Amino acid sequence: MRGDCGRLVPFASGSCFSLANSTSPSLERKITEFHGQPKFIINEVHKIAGEGEFNLKAVAKKLKANKNNEWTPLEGDGDFRSDECESLLKQSDIVVTNPPFSLFREYVKQLFDYNKKFVIISNKNTITCKEIFPLIKANRLWVGATSFNKDLLFISPEKVEPANKPKSATRTVDGVVFLRSPSIWVTNLDHGRRHQPLPLMTMKENLKYSKHKEIKGKRKYDKYVNYDAIEVPFTDAIPSDHDGEMGVPISFLDKYNPDQFEIVGISLAMAKPMSAIAQKGTYVQGGPRFYIAHGDGTYKRLYDRIVIKSRRAKS
């Protein structure tokens, strides 16, 4: 967090950071709500001298040291559905939190019901849910400035022993063991990276120069057998001159520019049943997914795909 009150960052897992009356130059009232802990009401934020970086513990220490701020106990247990917490939510302009993933869809609905701006943590796969994806498609929710190719790190709770976790589930930074989570930030606050155009090659250039063996040297891109679109297995392999529909991995969303592409839909809702196309035993069965032909009478089932279309086709 930089030394000015214009840039604020969220607290750790399990907390809810809500900003109220943030149009004031001093951000006069902000409310932080902790599940099962006191609510921390920040009435005043001073500028921090210097241009150095501060970690969250240092920021929290300075906020607590300000006598104009106060700790007050919650009457309940901090459940976001309680009248008490909804009252705090109504006062806020921006909510920053790590909501319970098991109640994520209900939590997001509450934020939209109250027309709140937010920056929240989401499991990467949650964005394919039928309640969440339509919000992404309608440009009402999008991925923050985080990468699908990286996991978020969380400080390990005292009751959790990192040594009992698989090595792949932890990461040590400067001697501190963090727990890894396949999560991303999602938000309805616009940000500059969201409007940076993807630099892309044409289809011909991709087939000749792509760094991916799945693309380079082929005569053409694969087409799905159960939906009319081409398969683009990598975001950087999207052909800049293709005007039709394309299926891309969900990791495309951290590079999605709504000025450059239109989101048409998702394979979960658009894939035609393979039972109407191919004989049983020639493909792996499962929920709605796109399939491509192997060329030997069998078919490959793909991971979830987002269907997009270039906006150049409309210009």
Regions found by a protein language model. Name each.
Residues 1-96, 100-315:
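Class I S-adenosyl-L-methionine-dependent methyltransferase catalytic core
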